[in-house]
């Protein structure tokens, strides 16, 4: 992957986080622009790094299928999804039959997923 492509992926993630965060901040909701940008950016950086590591592993060992070495593509990204879910759980509050923060948790989780999608280079999907 060229440096400019990694930069484009990261920039796209920042713009996605900005759009989601701006909408949340405009409505005076918790977890605004900075939080959504950071979640989206962090997820995109992990995706770019994972893509780089996968390319390096496959370049070093082109006979990866014949040697029995198992390369698990997507393992790091899966941990990002569960980690952001854990972060979102911290934004949910319940008191006296009222639950608050579900939309904030969902928006953080979606921002992280969209950051992963942008970081993987699926521009049209993001």
Where does each model-flagged region fall?
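Short, non-helical or kinked segments that cap or interrupt transmembrane helices
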Residues: 26-39, 72-81, 95-110
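Phosphate-handling active-site elements
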Residues: 56-60, 99-100, 122-124
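Loop-to-transmembrane alpha-helix initiation sites
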Residues: 6-9, 121-126
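Hydrophobic, membrane-facing alpha-helical anchors
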Residues: 57-58, 75-91
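Alpha-helical transmembrane segments in inner-membrane proteins
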Residues: 9, 15-16, 85, 92-98, ...
């Amino acid at each position: 992957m060229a440096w400019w492509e990694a930069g484009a992926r990261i920039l796209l993630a920042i713009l996605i986080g900005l759009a989601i965060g701006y909408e949340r901040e405009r409505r005076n909701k918790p977890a605004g622009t900075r939080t959504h940008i950071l979640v989206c950016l962090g997820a995109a950086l992990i995706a770019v790094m994972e893509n780089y590591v996968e390319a390096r592993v496959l370049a070093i060992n082109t006979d990866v299928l014949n040697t029995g070495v198992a390369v698990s593509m997507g393992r790091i990204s899966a941990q990002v999804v569960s980690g952001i879910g854990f972060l979102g759980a911290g934004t949910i509050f319940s008191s006296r039959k009222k639950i608050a923060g579900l939309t904030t948790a969902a928006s953080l989780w979606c921002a992280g997923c969209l950051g992963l999608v942008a970081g993987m280079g699926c521009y049209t999907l993001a």
